[in-house]
Amino acid sequence: MRPNRYEDTGNTTGDVSSNTPSTSGRWDLRRLNPPNRLWGSNGVTFGPDGRLYVAQFLAGQISAVDTATGDVDVVVPLDGPVQAPDDLAFGADGSMYIADLTPGRVWRRSPEGAYSLVSDQVQVPNGITCVGDRLFVNEMKMNGRLLELFPDGGDPVVLTDGLALGNAMQLGPDGCLYYPHMIGNQVWRIPPDGGTPELFAEEVDDPVAVRFDRGGVLVVLSRGPAGIVTRIDLATGARSVVVSGVLGLDNAAFDAENRMFVSSFGSGGVTEMREDGRTREIVPRGLSGPFGVTVDLRGTVYAADHYRLASPGDSGEHDSSGVITHELQPFVHGITADDGLLHFASEYGDVRTYDPVHRTTRVRAQGLNEPTGIERSPDGALVVAESGAGRVVRIDGRIDGTDTVTVLAEGLRHPVDIAFDAEGRCYVSDDELGAVLRIDDGGTVTVADGLGAPQGLAVRGDELFTVDVEHRCLRAVSLTTGETRIDAENLAVGLPPGITRTEPALFAAGMPGTPHPFAGLAVAPDGSLLLSANGEGSVLRLSARAPL
C-alpha cells in the first residue's frame, strides 16, 4: 500500500516520504488522533479494475481503495495537472473523467495515464457521469448548467440551466439523468438528449448526491450532520429514510453485489452502508486539515477543520477516527477559545462567534480578504490576521450588538497568525516575509526573521513559538533576548517534501474554492503546545520535558 501523506507507526509523526519521525530534545510529542489516510473524500465510483476510486477535493488528488482490504493507492497525485478533483466517472473505454472544481476544468485520463483537457468552459464543475461514450457534467452554483461534453472535440451542449447547486448525478433505469438541487431540497430529471427538465422529488433532506442501486432504486444522500439516506421507488414514489450518523455525506457507489460505499466531504474516509443505515468502516475517517487549533480552560482541544468544528483524541467521546464532531461549521480556519465561546475566522471573508452550549452563531465581520489567524486581545477585542489584504485588524463589539473593524497594521506581505504576550503586546507571523513582527503604535517591529514560512503562533511565558512550514519545524524565540532555536523537527506540516504544485484559487466563479492550508498552534492551560499537523491530518500535543 502506498502511503497517502501519512506515517502510521509510533506515537510521533514525521515526513511521509522519508519515514523520519518528528524529533525534539525539549518536548515529548504525541498524536491526539491518527493520521487521515483519505481526507477530503468526495466523488466515488468503481473503476474497471474493481477498486473504488475516490476524488479528494481538499487533498488535491485521486486515490483507489481496495474495499476488501482498505488499502489506499494514490492514482492521480497532487502535483499533477488536476488541482481540485470533486467527482469522477469512467467511460466505456476505461478513461477516467475528472471534474476539477476550482479551476473550472474537466479532464480525461487515459487508461495509460495520459491527461488531456476536455473543457475549461464549465464553471464549478461537480457532478459528472458517463452514459456509454457520452459525457455529462453539471455546475455547483446558483443558476448552474447541465451540459454534455465531447472529449474528441466540439462545443459543449447545454441540456438545461437553473440548477440550484448541482452535484452527483446518474442515469436512471428510465433513461433519464437524475440530479440534485442542493439548495431547494429537490431531485430533477431530464433525458440525455435534452428536453424539459422534470421535478421528480421535493422535500428531500439536503440532497448532495443521487445514485441508483443495482435494483434501480433511487438513493439520495444528505449533506447534513445526521447522514440521512432517502430511498425512492421510481414506479410508486414510495420513500424510506434512514439515519446513518455519517456526517457530511458526499457520494456513493454500488459494487457488483449491490453493497453501497459512501464518502464524506466532512471527515473523509470510505464507509460501507447497509440499507438499514448500519455502517462498516473501510477506510477510517479523520480530520480534513486541520487548520487553526485552540484549547479552552477545561483543556478541551478544538480544531478548525474547514467544514466542521472538531475535537481530537482525549477531548471527549469519538469514533475510530479519534475525532469528535461538535458542529458542521462551513469554512472555519482560524479559531480561538474565549470564556465559553469560540471565535472563528473563515478564509472566505467572515469572522464569527459561536456559543457551543446554546449552539448559536453571531457574525462579527464580513467582507475581509482571507482572514486566517484570530486571537482575543487582553481588553476583549478580536484581532485577526487578514492575510489577503496584508493587514491586521481589530474587531470591537458595541453595546447595541454591532461591531466595528479598525486597522492595527497594514502593508504586511502575508500575515497568518496572531498572539499576545503577558504584557498585552501583539505579535503576528508572516509566512511570505519569513518573520514574526510586533505591532507597535500602528507600525511593526521585527522580532525574528529568516524563519522560513512561519504560520501558527503562540506565546508561552517569555518565549514565542511558531510553526515553520517551509522547514517543517517548531521554532522558539526568546522575547527578552531575541535568540531563536529549533525545538522540534520533521513535523508533518505543509506539502510532503519534494512536492510542488500550483495552489488552487480560494474562490471559483463566486463560490468557495480551495482553502489555503494553515498549520495552527496553541498553548494549553497545562503549558503543553497543540500543533496542527496538516500534512497528515492530526493534532500533536507537545509536553515539555523537565527541566525545560
Predicted regions and their residues:
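A short helix->beta-strand "capping" segment at the edge of beta-propeller domains
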Residues: G14-R37, R501-A508
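Structural signal for beta-propeller blades
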Residues: G60-I62, G104-V106, N143-L146, N185-V187, ...
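Short loop/turn segments that connect beta-strands within beta-propeller blades
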Residues: D66-G70, R109-G113, L149-G154, I190-G195, ...
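Beta-strand-rich domains and repeat architectures in extracellular enzymes and scaffolds
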Residues: L32-Q61, A533-S538
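Sequence/structural signature of beta-propeller modules
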Residues: M1-G25, R545-L548
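Beta-rich, blade/repeat-based domains predominating
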Residues: P35-D49, D79-M96, R105, Q121-N143, ...
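Beta-propeller fold detector
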Residues: D73-P77, S116-D120, V157-D161, E198-E202, ...
